[in-house]
Amino acid sequence: MGGRMPFNQSFWEEFLMGREGRLPTLPEISHVSKRVVRILGGNPGSMHLQGTNTYLVGTGRSRILIDTAQVKQASFLRLQRAPSQLIHSKKGLPVWISRISSFLRTHNLELSYVLLTHWHGDHTGGVPDLLAHSPSLADKIYKNCPDAGQNPITDGQIFSVNGATVRAVFTPGHSVDHMCFQLEEENALFTGDNVLGHGFSVAQDLGRYMHSLGDMASLGCGIGYPAHGAVIGNLPEKLEEYMKHREGRERMMLSTLTREQAQGEGGRVGETKGGLTLNEIVIAMYGRVPQEVVEKALAPSLLQVLWKLAEDRRVGFKPGDPLKRRWFALDQRKRNRVRGYPS
């Protein structure tokens, strides 16, 4: 859909830097349950929390690996690029392949499947190192919208080893190809980047993301194993928190548009000018803020909310220059006959 704005990675890295110091320390390798071992990717940072969580799943010699780690200098938030454009020409961080290969060797384990939650480099970047270490895994890499040489994952597909039955669940929104994985023996869900152990995630498509959160909740899983952060002990509660957070942003947006439109009839911005521009929305919601903050942080986030509401036919917009586009709340009677919303 046209008009969406990419998130600016460097800005968000600086903006989120402060939360690193408040995160709990996670062990490099941890048995988080009797059938799940978490191995950190060695890439802690503002965008990755304590680092990418990779998981070995099963109880026998043969295990399932969920996610690899990070490509060197990978850009986590290049959400505007399609999966097919991401070329893994660089090897991953050496600390991750060292950790996992040592663990596999020490415990006499082998991998039967390598499942990738989505295409972002902090989840797929370790694949070249893994194949260099174990060439026999070349036909065991699985990803939705697979890269060359990889196998596809379909919604509902089952992967089984001794002690673990893992079912793939298609959950787009954070990325177009995002998959979660349900561990049936534990009624647990590997949540990928859709739900994190700390804070909130970002969405490439907010409408699909909200739908996916609902799909995840409908599974009724009690435990969440996120791709970043600590184990989620109460996944239903966390999912409700995520959905309420997003819904709160939608209510705030609708309230702002409705209020400003009503005031516009008295001569302020609003209906008299055919709605509010993005900059006017920012001022109405947050007051005067630096333009850099608007362009690099608030605008992309608020546009996701606006497009979601437009798809729900709760707001409309005047077609034209995306930067000058005017948005307005729809009243109930206009929702089914308004022009200017995405189909």
From Swiss-Prot:
UniProt record, GO biological process: secondary metabolite biosynthetic process
Binding site for Zn(2+) 2: D122, H123
Residues holding Zn(2+) 1: H118, H120
SMART domains named in the record: Lactamase_B
Record keywords, A-Z: Hydrolase, Metal-binding, Zinc
Pfam families: Lactamase_B
Cofactor binding description: Binds 2 Zn(2+) ions per subunit.
Cofactor list: Zn(2+)
GO terms of molecular function: hydrolase activity; metal ion binding
Pathways per UniProt: Secondary metabolite biosynthesis
Active site feature: D122
EC top class, as a word: hydrolase
EC number: 3.1.-.-
Keyword Metal-binding recorded: yes
InterPro entries per record: LACTB2-like_MBL-fold, Metallo-B-lactamas, RibonucZ/Hydroxyglut_hydro, Sec-metab_biosynth-thioest, WH-like_DNA-bd_sf
Function: Lactamase-like protein; part of the gene cluster that mediates the biosynthesis of neosartoricin B, a prenylated anthracenone that probably exhibits T-cell antiproliferative activity, suggestive of a physiological role as an immunosuppressive agent. The non-reducing polyketide synthase nscA probably synthesizes and cyclizes the decaketide backbone. The hydrolase nscB then mediates the product release through hydrolysis followed by spontaneous decarboxylation. The prenyltransferase nscD catalyzes the addition of the dimethylallyl group to the aromatic C5.
Family membership noted in the UniProt record: Belongs to the metallo-beta-lactamase superfamily.
Name of the protein described by the UniProt record: Lactamase-like protein nscB
Species: Arthroderma otae (strain ATCC MYA-4605 / CBS 113480)
Gene name per UniProt: nscB
